A protein has these predicted regions:
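Multi-pass membrane proteins that catalyze or facilitate reactions on polyprenyl-/lipid-phosphate substrates
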Residues: 1-271
Length: 271
């Protein structure tokens, strides 16, 4: 993977990371179009590890929300109570991804480069988003995130382990299925991305090192490629993250997912 390919793929990942589309799915499609060997071990690692840039974007832009929860501002809770509730719910929502991610790791790895599967999932996801607002938004009036709701959303998030399925779409729909408002569901999805993507990145790095693939990081320009991808990703990813809590997913945005789904499906189905 050369530097031009790295830059293009990183920009695509940054632009799609915080939208209800599959950033990984779009990356795989673009990698295929650019002639990148998507079965290559380093490319698979790059596809996951580059999302570390998204983590940095969220933490840098919303660090106050991580250290000064909204409930403190509104006076609903004391500082330490609000901090405990915020992180405890994130932990509960992350547990399913940890358990199922480890259990189905082989399936995820073997299908990460499956362009046909990715294409189909993008198409199905795009079509589903056209109707999910009508299906789940009726009666959505809750803003309180209970531990039970956090756990259910965490399990629904695991559907995104299928390459081409959007993590943010899964969690937002999961929240709305629990009668949370779109805003409340999107906010939890936004913050849940941090521990989830951080865990996925750590797992990928661990697998590379423990299976003797750690040398891949220092092979040729691989390490520089990872650094370049993460840095390039920061700008578009940061722009998306900056408006993430203010321009929450709505029906007009679904067009982006449908477009991506059709694009990916047409390409994938011909391979």
């Amino acid at each position: 993977m050369d530097f031009i390919q790295t830059i293009i793929i990183s920009i695509v990942e940054g632009l799609t990371e915080f939208l209800p589309v599959s950033s990984t799915g779009h990356m795989i499609i673009v990698e295929n179009l650019l002639g990148v060997d998507i079965q290559d071990k380093f490319v698979n690692a790059f596809t996951v590890i580059i999302q570390f840039g998204a983590i940095l974007s969220v933490i840098c832009l919303y660090w106050k929300r991580f250290f000064y929860p909204e409930a403190v501002k509104t006076g609903e809770k004391t500082y330490w109570k609000a901090m405990f509730d915020f992180y405890a719910r994130l932990l509960v929502g992350t547990v399913p991804a940890v358990v199922l991610g480890l259990a189905f790791n082989d399936f995820i790895e073997s299908n990460l480069g499956n362009v046909q599967l990715v294409g189909w999932m993008l198409v199905i996801g795009g079509i589903f988003m056209l109707f999910c607002d009508k299906i789940f938004n009726k009666g959505s009036e809750q803003t309180k995130l209970t531990y039970k709701r956090a756990l259910i959303i965490g399990f629904i998030q695991c559907i995104a382990m299928i390459p081409g399925v959007s993590r943010s779409m899964s969690t937002i729909v999961g929240g709305m299925s629990q009668r949370l408002t779109r805003k409340a569901a999107a906010e939890f999805s936004f913050f849940l991305a941090v521990p989830t993507m951080f865990g996925a990145t750590c797992l990928e790095v661990y697998k590379l090192i423990s299976h003797g693939g750690g040398s891949l990081l220092t092979q040729g320009n691989n390490l520089f490629t990872l650094i370049l991808g993460s840095v390039v990703h920061l700008r578009p990813g940061g722009d998306r993250a900056a408006g993430g809590l203010h321009r929450l997913p709505a029906v007009p945005r679904v067009g982006a997912d449908v477009h991506g789904g059709i694009f990916g499906g047409e390409r994938g189905l011909h391979l």
